[in-house]
Amino acid sequence: MGVDTRKKLNSNSRVGDIIKIKFFAAITKAFNLHPVFQIFIMTDLSQFDPDIAGNPNNNIFGLPFSEEDARLIILPVPWEVTVSYGAGTARAAEQIRKASTQIDIFDSENPEGWKEGFYLRDVDKKLLMKSDYLRKEAELYIDYISKGQKVEDNQFMLKTLKDVNEGSNYLNKWVYDQIKGLLSRGKLVALLGGDHSTPLGYFKALAEKYQDFGILQIDAHCDLRSDYSGFSYSHASIMYNALQEIENLKTLLQIGIRDYSGSELEIIHNSNDRIITYFDKDIKCRLFEGQTWKQITDEIVNRLPQKVHISFDIDGLDPKLCPNAGTPVHGGFEIEELFYLFTKILRSGRQLIGFDLLEVAVGENNWDANVGARVLWKLCNLLVKSNPV
């Protein structure tokens, strides 16, 4: 195909977009349709060329949408107060946004999905400052208890623990309020962390909107610890807290788990199948012995409920894809293995109701952010595809 032909096709496509915009505007005005339909009429894409380099002055992926126009809103949560090893994830959203302009605006599973609008909110500076301050306090506390010192013998450490736990309560309410507000406006919502403690308020807002649902957790860790290191809402406790506080979270299905404690294993065994865990070692053994990934994913999908939220901790991947992750563990998935599973979930007729992407860390280069941006792109396209207007 020659250059002139491609230009003509692109021009025809933009003319088509203008016609669609005018048509939906007329229909919406005439029939007083729900505001969600205005998503398709508020952004004029006739001057946007998805085939050229991404414009860093635009929003995520170089897309030209505003929050009002976009159907899917990504909420950044810059929080890493309780991380117990490497830090850097509080600033992941900024780095992922920069890296995202390198992605081609096309998804083979949903070629037109981006036209519904993806928008990343600006990072809340107050929340980031709060995270930075409490992180310094938490580091002192973690160092203190790691040496076998007793917290009850030190008034300063008792106050530090109290401050961190109060900060986590503040975070949970902040996330819940933000997500609930967006859902009430008819938006699809995703969360971009930040550490894995961040989505509890998100889960609670989803539970109110969708009633019974399940979480598919991609992770190297179970995150089923109770009061880890004394922190009520540690990144290592997110799924424990979700199960304790959200009654209509019916199923937690974990895959890729390869670093866990005996107490967490006991919680799984005593959960009456509310927690279903596919350990990384067991998956690998089944593959080594001749089973296919198709067979394993068929089984996984069949055990999920109708409504599914994906909680994606980046350390669920092979560490070569996320070398700066806060708690890296050898093993893990290739990205395409997970994309295959996610696509199969949608093809089964199940509904993806949301997702979070967490623990992407900032390194010396932008490799982690690049990988994170590509995972985010795929998840955004899957979410809008699973929720047609």
Regions found by a protein language model. Give the residues of each.
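Intrinsic-disorder-associated, low-complexity terminal segments enriched in Asp/Asn/His/Tyr and depleted
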Residues: 4, 10-12, 17, 32-34
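Conserved alpha-helical scaffold segments that buttress catalytic/binding sites
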Residues: 43-389
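Short hydrophobic targeting helices and cationic amphipathic motifs
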Residues: 24, 33-38
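Repetitive helical segments and hydrophobic/amphipathic motifs
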Residues: 16-19, 29, 228
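Polybasic, lysine-rich low-complexity intrinsically disordered segments
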Residues: 7-8, 21, 39
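Ala/Thr-enriched low-complexity intrinsically disordered regions
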Residues: 5, 25-30
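Long, low-complexity, intrinsically disordered N-terminal extensions of eukaryotic proteins, enriched
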Residues: 18, 41-43
